Amino acid sequence: MININCNDDFLKDNIVNLLDQKKFFLNNPHNIQYFFQSNIIIKEKNLEISTSANKLNLNLPLSFNEFFEKFFDMISNEKVYLQNYEYYPFKQLIKKNEKNIFLSEIQNTIMSNLLLNSNNGIKKIDLIKIIWPNDKDIFFNKLDTHLTNLKNYLNSESDFDLKFTSKSGLIKLVFN
């Protein structure tokens, strides 16, 4: 969901590795789709982190926990506009006016991957592997149940009508 750019490859590799250990939603190296891009520039005595909407300067040295906390605070306010809603992937939140709809981890993973792949869709098998990477058995009906539950949950919490098509093992969002 986020692409990291850095002026120091060693620093970037370490940051990506540590964020990955925290189960932070980074973009897949084989997939160029992401919601946001973060630029990290190391200077003499500080680390400059920026997104399209925010900029942060951190004094060096700093602990990874401090970096992660500040980075997460900054990136969690990034949003994607979806119809008349704001989707905050890092908060697992969909918002319209003052109405907040909180998503479970699986619901958020489904929503983010449907949005990231809104142009061409995503293969069901790929989505299953993202959600349940350790499952040896693949059950398409398990994914279908979660898709239906997400659609029903959004509809019950608001007037959000999640529409998608499923053809030949490919799921794609449908926008009005």
Show where each model-derived region lies.
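Short, positively charged loop/turn segments that connect secondary-structure elements
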Residues: 133-142
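DNA-binding patch around the recognition helix
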Residues: 76-89, 95-96, 101-103, 145-176
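Short acidic low-complexity segments
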Residues: 24-46
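Short, charged N-terminal beta->alpha structural module
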Residues: 1-31
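Basic, amphipathic DNA-recognition helix from helix-turn-helix-like DNA-binding domains
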Residues: 39, 43-83
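Short amphipathic alpha-helical recognition elements used for nucleic-acid or partner binding
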Residues: 99-131, 150
